[in-house]
Amino acid sequence: MKNAKILSNLISDKDALDNLNWQPHRRDGRANADIFELYDGRNNNNEGPKAALMRYRPGATVKPHLHPGYELIFVLKGTLINDTGEHPEGTLEVCPPGSTH
């Protein structure tokens, strides 16, 4: 497949995550968060698919916000604490369109 992004060993090699080109991400009032963009297929109306890896450092915060489309949260390292509880490594949370958190 041409132009495919291959990210290997993200689960088995925890250092692989540290080697990605993370960029600071402050959208929706985030603090202590970084983003690694995978793709952005949104159109001019901000509709369409987008995928990224997010890294939340200890003490990270996010203000409540709406997701117009699905959001998949897969915890690669550490523990995610949100309004649905505490989620350890290996947890996949599927948030439906229209969800807020």
Describe the role of every protein-language-model region.
Residues 70:
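Alpha/beta-hydrolase fold active-site loops
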Residues 30-67, 81, 85-86, 96-100:
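Conserved short histidine dyad/triad with adjacent acidic residue
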Residues 1-47:
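A short, N-terminal "cap"/entry segment at the start of jelly-roll beta-barrel domains
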Residues 73:
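Structured binding elements
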